Amino acid sequence: MRKILIPIALLLLAVGCNRTKTTSNEVDINPFTLSDSIFIESEFGDDYSHYTMNIDLPVTDNDTLRQNILKWILSDNTDDYEAYFQEDMNRFFAEEGNEPNSFFEGNYSLSEQTDLYVTYIAEGYAYTGGAHPLPWYYGITFSKTDGSIMGYDLFENPEQLKGIISKSIEKQYFEPNNTEEEEYLFEPDETFQLPTNEPWIETDSGVVCYGPFEIATC
């Protein structure tokens, strides 16, 4: 995974931002944890399979904002988080996590908020066999004005982000003036891809994060 921090002033200068209205909808949290394990016997050895989910459930008088955060964490079809993750855990133990030493750990946490927005981070690891676990990490920012996601639709032309992201990757992860490395690792702007995940806001930066193998094979 690659987490890219872009100064917010640079983003606003380059592409513009439409939301300016303020509000004071404070979001508190109600922590929820679901954790269990089962003992599995196999011809290769006996051990436990583990499942853990930690969630900062939103508590706010802004019902639209609360519902949209829950839909992002769960789905559009339910707000019953206990039943949703109980079913997810049962499915994990029955399918991917039915081998010794398997595990799944997920976290949805409230990262920060201002009068304008609230940002959540989702991260975790899963291991169901093979050489290494599968990690994930991404964020999302919701407007406190109308509860909407403040992602790519914030920008008049998201394609302009490609050049900014490419230069930010080069600055944060690679030594300057390494021409050979740049030749192998950086695509031309016309073929450079934006990440699948929406960008989000952290304090003084806009953040984009590429998933495993999304822009590289190693």
Located regions from the model:
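Sec-dependent signal peptide hydrophobic core
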Residues: 5-9
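Positively charged n-region of N-terminal signal peptides that target proteins for export
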Residues: 1-4, 18-19
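C-terminal motif of bacterial Sec signal peptides marking the signal peptidase cleavage site
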Residues: 13-16
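Compositionally biased intrinsically disordered regions enriched in Thr/Gly
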Residues: 18-218
